């Protein structure tokens, strides 16, 4: 089942602004050999949600401000993206790609005004993204769940769906959006940290219920993952997950997969 959606006028404006920015030949934010890869990831964030691209744009603007203040012009992937926000494919691409170029200090100092102007422009894009509180893609997700669950009821399958997204910012937004649409009961989040308030409460109850048993490994990261999967299996209806749930987690009891964000590698879809 594939559902089409039409972005709102503000979403289209944001897309055009960011896309136009990325097409410029003389960007201050990333001038090195990894520009193409960084641009691809930015477009992925843009396609994920306004919340995902807003935080990324602000992070790039912050790095530009630091560049002017400190004179440190060496670019690293973590200057642009939070580590947890990078998928394994994106991390691998950075690791296997050529090293970033380092600007000469005397050349960079002559471009400080341009760097400041670009940082201000990026913050303007981020402000526009923040102003878009409702994403049309998320609206369509509610319709997709309703149609999907109706089909599951028709064939007698368990009403459980997992939604995959690349961004924890998008994950947080979708959780709030689905709660407002009436999907709050049985909603669970799964990501690399699993430290949301709801996840911590599920983990606390799971530890109490299994105290003295052999399910508890004593490894908090592993036990948190197990607690969330058990909750989803026994009580949940919808899990919103990042790539962390795509590997090494048994979710065969789940009846429906929603690819909210598509991965670069088509094999990832099969793994999901």
Describe every region a protein language model picked out:
Residues 265-272:
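Conserved SF2 helicase motif VI
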Residues 14-17, 21-31, 132-168, 172-177:
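Conserved interdomain hinge at the start of the Helicase C-terminal
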Residues 120-147, 211-216:
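Glycine-rich phosphate-binding "P-loop"
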Residues 59, 167-201:
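Conserved helicase motor "Helicase C" RecA-like lobe of SF1/SF2 P-loop NTPases
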Residues 188-242:
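Conserved helicase ATPase core of P-loop NTP-dependent helicases/translocases
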Residues 249-261:
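A short beta-strand element within the Helicase C-terminal
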Residues 168-169, 238-244, 264:
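Conserved helicase core region in the C-terminal RecA-like lobe
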Residues 1-121, 180:
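Inter-lobe connector of SF1/SF2 helicase motors
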